[in-house]
UniProtKB/Swiss-Prot annotation:
Modified residues (N6,N6,N6-trimethyllysine): K4
CDD domains membership: RuBisCO_large_I
Protein name: Ribulose bisphosphate carboxylase large chain
Residues modified to N6-carboxylysine: K191
Lineage of the species this protein comes from: Eukaryota, Viridiplantae, Streptophyta, Embryophyta, Tracheophyta
Family (UniProt): Belongs to the RuBisCO large chain family. Type I subfamily.
Superkingdom classification of source: Eukaryota
Entry EC no(s): 4.1.1.39
Function: RuBisCO catalyzes two reactions: the carboxylation of D-ribulose 1,5-bisphosphate, the primary event in carbon dioxide fixation, as well as the oxidative fragmentation of the pentose substrate in the photorespiration process. Both reactions occur simultaneously and in competition at the same active site.
Note: The basic functional RuBisCO is composed of a large chain homodimer in a 'head-to-tail' conformation. In form I RuBisCO this homodimer is arranged in a barrel-like tetramer with the small subunits forming a tetrameric 'cap' on each end of the 'barrel'.
Keywords per UniProt: Calvin cycle, Carbon dioxide fixation, Chloroplast, Lyase, Magnesium, Metal-binding, Methylation, Monooxygenase, Oxidoreductase, Photorespiration, Photosynthesis, Plastid
PROSITE patterns with a match to the protein in the record: RUBISCO_LARGE (PS00157)
Organism: Sarracenia flava (Yellow pitcher plant)
GO biological process: photorespiration; reductive pentose-phosphate cycle
Amino acid sequence: VGFKAGVKDYKLTYYTPDYETKATDILAAFRVTPQPGVPPEEAGAAVAAESSTGTWTTVWTDGLTSLDRYKGRCYHIEPVAGEENQYIAYVAYPLDLFEEGSVTNMFTSIVGNVFGFKALRALRLEDLRIPPAYSKTFQGPPHGIQVERDKLNKYGRPLLGCTIKPKLGLSAKNYGRAVYECLRGGLDFTKDDENVNSQPFMRWRDRFLFCAEAIYKAQAETGEIKGHYLNATAGTWEEMIKRAVFARELGVPIVMHDYLTGGFTANTSLAHYCRDNGLLLHIHRAMHAVIDRQKNHGIHFRVLAKALRMSGGDHIHAGTVVGKLEGERDITLGFVDLLREDYIEQDRTRGIYFSQDWVSLPGVLPVASGGIHVWHMPALTEIFGDDSVLQFGGGTLGHPWGNAPGAVANRVALEACVQARNEGRDLAREGNEIIREASKWSPELAAACEVWKEIKFEFPAMDTL
């Protein structure tokens, strides 16, 4: 008879409320804001269609394949409480729609085209359920939390870091000097800022050499293993690998990548190189707020965090809850658990739409960084626990006596908080008291307490449910 040409409603094909999801399906939760007059079922079905097999009209080649096998299905829709004309649309995608081991392909399919769709006023991807059948096709983090602790020989406490400031303008020699002072004072890591790549005032090779010198000198003096996140991000993938190879030849423990500006393809390749060559990989999330800050449009950071765990990274920045950068406590802890734990139970109060089973994929250390100082230490220790990296840039380098005393202040504050917690004290209630007690026998900490006693960044978090 031929096929029936013409345009038909998406919901006739792609809205299937009686569908039972399979254990191998990738499940997505979208926050959909339809245009006026578009029913939510049609909007949800349109999302399922445009992010899987559908197009705007019936095509004769539909008859050459099994749509039932390959189409995305919108299987449930619920209104968002307290919001007008917003719905959560749940979509199930058959696994065969995706290339194995490619975050790039997964995102191109699920969010590649549909966000510009005219029938929608706005669209946000809130969460993804990655089935083990798919996550098992990824290497994941180069090493993971336990292997990193074993490499560094550091247990039972969060790790301490510091971003070297001013982020741009220092010569390589002075930069290395700042690194040495911080590491000598008691930090575990120092860090290249995300936009430190290879600029005219400091070429990458010079920076790598002076930082390596600083690391070895500080290790010799303190007897502890030290590291500096050498930013390998570059304009081409070949150049990035060249920098990672040089870092490996210097014998340093860790390199760094800006995974959103660098891209998932480059990130996954770098993660593979890092595992094969014993390098840890620190991930910075520069550009994330462009994608995740709007409440009704874009992609929530928990999805970007899951994608990073699949693509590969040993550390990733994840907000502070208490500093100058974004993060509501329950929601932040939700995606922190998604980064660290093997199995995470569905919990809508924390923004977790699906239970996620990572099976044996290594975990990622969350990094708390941005506007934090010694007075925040009890809260950070309590909120993030041992498996985290606490990074104080200005909170180290802004110390009135210099970098090394700034590092000493942070290390003393951290050790005091960990000891108090281990003795059963309540960090949330007694935090200030614990810091004050410790500062009595640490002049460096006392000076830091004095400088930052009044600093607060008091704005409400945007990232609410």
